[in-house]
C-alpha cells in the first residue's frame, strides 16, 4: 500500500456538512464526484472558487481535493464546501509543507473572510409555548 500524504477536514454551515480529502496529486478538485466547475447554481460557484482564487492556482498544481457534502440547502452546502477546502489546504500545508506557508494561507483566509476557517456558530432558536415559533406569539383578544 502506497502512503500518499493526505489530510481530512470538514466544514459546516447550519445542517450542511462537507468533508474534504486533500492529498498529493495533479490538481483535481471534485465535489460529490463531479468537477468543481459543475457546482450549481452558477452564482454560488464563485463562492466555492474563493479559497482557490485567494491563494492562487499555483498552490493547487500538485494537490487533489475530493469533497463530499450532505444535508442543508444549496447555499449552506456551498459555504460548507468552501470552508472544508480552505481548512484542508491549511491542514495540508501544516502537515506536509511548512509552518510559514500555513501561516500565510491562514492570514489570507482570515483577512478575506473569517468563515473560511471558523464555523458559523448560529443555530435555530427552539420553539416555545404560547406561539407558533421561537418569538412569534398567538394573537391576543381583549373582547
Curated annotation (Swiss-Prot):
Composition bias type Basic residues, residue spans: 134-143
UniProt-listed SUPFAM superfamilies: Ribosomal protein S5 domain 2-like
Region of interest: Disordered: 124-143
GO (cellular component) term, any one: fungal biofilm matrix
Domain of life according to the entry: Eukaryota
Any Gene Ontology biological process: maturation of SSU-rRNA from tricistronic rRNA transcript (SSU-rRNA, 5.8S rRNA, LSU-rRNA)
Entries under Pfam families matching the protein: Ribosomal_S9
GO molecular function, one term: RNA binding
Keyword list, A-Z: Ribonucleoprotein, Ribosomal protein
Similarity remark: Belongs to the universal ribosomal protein uS9 family.
Name this protein carries in UniProt: Small ribosomal subunit protein uS9
Amino acid at each position: 500500500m502506497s502512503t500518499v500524504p493526505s489530510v481530512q477536514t470538514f466544514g459546516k454551515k447550519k445542517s450542511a456538512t462537507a468533508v474534504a480529502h486533500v492529498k498529493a496529486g495533479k490538481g483535481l478538485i471534485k465535489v460529490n464526484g463531479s468537477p468543481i466547475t459543475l457546482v450549481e447554481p452558477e452564482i454560488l460557484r464563485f463562492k466555492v472558487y474563493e479559497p482557490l482564487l485567494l491563494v492562487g492556482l499555483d498552490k493547487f498544481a500538485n494537490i487533489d481535493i475530493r469533497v463530499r457534502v450532505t444535508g442543508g440547502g444549496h447555499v449552506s452546502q456551498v459555504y460548507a464546501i468552501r470552508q472544508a477546502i480552505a481548512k484542508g489546504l491549511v491542514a495540508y500545508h501544516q502537515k506536509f509543507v511548512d509552518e510559514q506557508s500555513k501561516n500565510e494561507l491562514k492570514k489570507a483566509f482570515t483577512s478575506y473572510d473569517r468563515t473560511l476557517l471558523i464555523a458559523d456558530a448560529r443555530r435555530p432558536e427552539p420553539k416555545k409555548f404560547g406561539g407558533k415559533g421561537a418569538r412569534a406569539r398567538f394573537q391576543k383578544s381583549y373582547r
